[in-house]
Amino acid sequence: MLSLVLCFFVMFLLGVAVVVLSPSPYFSALGLVFVAVSGCFIVLYHGGTFLSLVLVLLYLGGMMVVFVYSAALAADPYPEVLGGRVIWFFVICVLCICFAGYMSFNDFFLDVSVACEGADYTGGIFGAEWLGVTTFYEVGLILVLAGWALLVCLFSVLVVVRGVNRGALRAV
């Protein structure tokens, strides 16, 4: 199971590299999807079921909408592809560092899991994250304020990306 988490960490790092190093917003959006999905699986592995679901909905539901609007307003007829020697060198270095970390800490994680195996763990059905859910839905005002805050963020990004002229109609 640890190797699955390591794969998600590698996917997370590669997604961050694609977002940072990509010259075109289309490929950055693809990297953002990799970062969101792998980060949510890492949170899910550590026991945050509701938190990972909320993060997927926020990243892929809210941030991708803003990213699509931004990409539509700054559309390139011929987007540049991610590539080059520097990027491949970065990818190989990240994979080597992750592999070296996995090999050096592999025995440590096995010792910790063996030590925790004999412990008397009595976990309940409800985790600590459910307390935040009840607080969030107990007062409906918080939900309304969160929705308005996301709407204001969307419009502020659209104003920033709009440009000097007529916004999305400038290509027409």
Swiss-Prot record:
Query: Which gene carries the instructions for this protein?
Result: MT-ND6
Cellular localization per UniProt: Mitochondrion membrane
Annotated family: Belongs to the complex I subunit 6 family.
Q: What does this protein do?
A: Core subunit of the mitochondrial membrane respiratory chain NADH dehydrogenase (Complex I) that is believed to belong to the minimal assembly required for catalysis. Complex I functions in the transfer of electrons from NADH to the respiratory chain. The immediate electron acceptor for the enzyme is believed to be ubiquinone.
Enumerate the transmembrane spans: 1-21, 25-45, 48-68, 86-106, 108-128, 141-161
Membrane topology field: Multi-pass membrane protein
GO MF terms listed in the record are:
NADH dehydrogenase (ubiquinone) activity
- Quote the Gene3D superfamilies the UniProt record gives: NADH-ubiquinone/plastoquinone oxidoreductase chain 6, subunit NuoJ
Q: What is its EC number?
A: 7.1.1.2
Main location, first listed in the record: mitochondrion
What is catalysed by this protein? a ubiquinone + NADH + 5 H(+)(in) = a ubiquinol + NAD(+) + 4 H(+)(out)
Is Magnesium there in the keyword field?
no
Q: Looking at the keywords, is Transmembrane helix present?
A: yes
Q: What is this protein called?
A: NADH-ubiquinone oxidoreductase chain 6
Query: What top-level class of enzyme does the UniProt entry assign?
Result: translocase
What highest taxon heads this organism's lineage?
Eukaryota
Gene Ontology cellular component annotations, sorted alphabetically: mitochondrial membrane
* Entry keyword set: Electron transport, Membrane, Mitochondrion, NAD, Respiratory chain, Translocase, Transmembrane, Transmembrane helix, Transport, Ubiquinone
